[in-house]
Amino acid sequence: MTQASDCSSEKTLSEAIKGRRATLSFLPDPVPENDLKKILDAGLSAPSAYNLQPWRFVVVREVEQRARLRRAAMNQLKVEEAPVVVVACADLEGWRSGDLDEIIRLAQQHGYGDEARHASMRKNIANFFSAPGNAGGLAPDFAVWANRQTMIAMTTMMWMAEVLGYDTAPMEGFYEDQVKATLGILAHVRVVALLAIGHRKGEDKRFAGRFAMQRTVFAEKWGNPIP
């Protein structure tokens, strides 16, 4: 795979946000390894409550595997066309099976807090996610919380891809059981979304307009439009 990056097409974040459209069809041109790593690293740098990072990502690039994934994704052509499809997942058991230990180790490595704080982190995280009602009552269940966290990370990847000059298509249309079977995803892991990355073939969707801020953003109380 070529290592060259088409830096001439890089955008500012503002340009990426304003100009992004869901890409309907992709060229087969590969995404260079160094650009892909930048995209993935951006997602791994996303905010995460308690630094738990419940997200997991399966990067699908092989032609045959993309074709199989397409069948599990409601036969969407872009899944097979895009040179890279990132399958965003949420690990519902990671914090119980090693992630919490790694969080503490990383905190120690980076000089974050002392032993008392690390002990408190371990206790508080375990208590929070073991509490009746799950997630301390802040979410209907742990899967909902992990899904939210994973979407933040995947969206961050999407913006980095757009900044680097690539086109993207986030997708929620798939059969989770089929995606899991195709990719060998474990039972305690949820498939959250798919993100196709590449260069568009033809035109993107035309801009269809967005609600005015006064319709969707309120000041201080619900229903009070922001000035």
Segments and roles (model prediction):
Residues 1-227:
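Acidic, surface-exposed loops and disordered segments
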